[in-house]
Amino acid sequence: MHVFDNNGIELKAECSIGEEDGVYGLILESWGPGDRNKDYNIALDYIIERLVDSGVSQVVVYLASSSVRKHMHSLDERKIHPGEYFTLIGNSPRDIRLKMCGYQAYFSRTGRKEIPSGNRTKRILINVPGIYSDSFWASIIRGELSELSQPTDDESLLNMRVSKLIKKTLSQPEGSRKPVEVERLQKVYVRDPMVKAWILQQSKGICENCGKNAPFYLNDGNPYLEVHHVIPLSSGGADTTDNCVALCPNCHRELHYSKNAKELIEMLYVNINRLQK
């Protein structure tokens, strides 16, 4: 898991959500050696900004490196700030981050020291008192991307999210092996906008069946292709990248209604490596 910037680009800042030594929160991995997690400071700025935007005004921050945890057994000893809480308001996220990192300089690998020096980008655990929600921290890590990536059964909302997601740098999403069914006047399925956006992004505007360019461009500037589930959702198909293709409208209709649709589907499996039966 990594922190994302406000453009949906994954930063080189590894993190995780969970509990360590009885404390639940966000764990931000240290910077180093070399370029490992080199976006630590930028990521921490985003984390602070999003916490404040979420209404959080104070946190508790602990050092969480393996060496410190080994030599400093008391949680209170590993709390980096002198007061009970570390405040997030009153300054810019950058200034608050500099203060937070400055406290880290009072710790060596084995304990506290009187004169600050050395690494100010150590592995830390950020705790928000009273918060025990993975989804809360996921929204802090991902920013706007967290909301945009939520599956939905609303076609217009799905397409709005896809329109925004397709402009971002996306890693291949997991999708859903068993999409949620929603009963309306007709049965519909909750769709993952990340899957649809990634498929369209990978196609680069070219139909994955006939190889021709998309027939036109949408108002948002994206080429118009339709995402087709090779095994239909109504037949138990997954809403995942290994069951989806980007097609021009003509090929899409052909796969649904042509008398040789089965042969066309088999050719998709032959020609597109990511597809799985």
Curated annotation (Swiss-Prot):
EC main group: hydrolase
Domain spans labelled HNH: 207-257
Keyword Nuclease: yes
InterPro entries: HNH, HNH_nuc, NA-targeting_endonuclease
Keywords of the record: Endonuclease, Hydrolase, Nuclease, Restriction system
A Gene Ontology molecular function term of the record: endonuclease activity
SMART domains reported for this sequence: HNHc (SM00507)
Pfam families given in the database record: HNH
Keyword ATP-binding among UniProt keywords: no
EC number(s) reported in the record: 3.1.21.-
Domain of life: Bacteria
Any one of the GO BP annotations: DNA restriction-modification system
Other facts: Encoded by the SOS-inducible cryptic lambdoid prophage e14. UV treatment leads to prophage excision and reduced levels of McrA.
Protein purpose: Restriction of 5-methyl and 5-hydroxymethylcytosines at the specific DNA sequence 5'-C(me)CGG-3'.
Protein name: Type IV methyl-directed restriction enzyme EcoKMcrA
Annotated organism of origin: Escherichia coli (strain K12)
Upper taxonomic lineage: Bacteria, Pseudomonadati, Pseudomonadota, Gammaproteobacteria, Enterobacterales
Gene it is expressed from: mcrA
